[in-house]
Amino acid sequence: GYGLTPLVVAAQAVPIVAVAPALVLWLGTGAATKAAIATYLTYFPVTIATTRGIQAVPAESRELFHTIGASKRTVLFGLEIPFALPLIFVGLETAAAFSVVGAIVAELPFGSPDGLGVVILTSWQFYIFQPESLYCVALAACSLGAVFVLGIRSIAYFSLGARSQGEVL
């Protein structure tokens, strides 16, 4: 069913600029807060893709597992997750790109002395004088996101083989 989907969607509707300061208050200014902010931006595509993949399992397959008396765990790990893997990897690709945004946004409320977020703030404040820095950060973020996405695609290709090329769904 749809169980947690409305809560996941509602949580994603809260802007990251509203969530980040609250996380700083709760978790401090360390790596855990940065990871939490990146996670906040990445859980949504993975959760939705996984849910859709599991919902797409054919009824006949579920009936077969039910007929042979498979436990809920066997159905989950033997049928649902393997069937959903192509969509899970699509969600992970999207999340990989969002993780770069999350990591950069996570640097903004901390007053961090270095990082891409600091360069963005500095370039924005002095845009007339340093536009090249802003462009370099944009290029670095794009490159990092592309590397992450290609990494996920490589894992998907080696994990799923032909299924990662769209032959399942």
List each language-model region with its residue ranges.
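Non-cytoplasmic
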Residues: 91-146, 150
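C-terminal transmembrane helix and the adjacent membrane-cytosol boundary/short C-terminal tail
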Residues: 55, 135-169
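Functionally critical, cavity-lining and gating residues within the transmembrane helices
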Residues: 16, 20, 45, 63, ...
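Transmembrane alpha-helices
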Residues: 36-40, 72-105, 152
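Transmembrane-helix boundary motif in ABC transporter permease subunits
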Residues: 1-8
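Short cytoplasmic-facing helical segments at TM-TM junctions of multi-pass membrane proteins
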Residues: 49-88, 120
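Generic hydrophobic transmembrane alpha-helix motif, especially the helices
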Residues: 8-45, 52-53
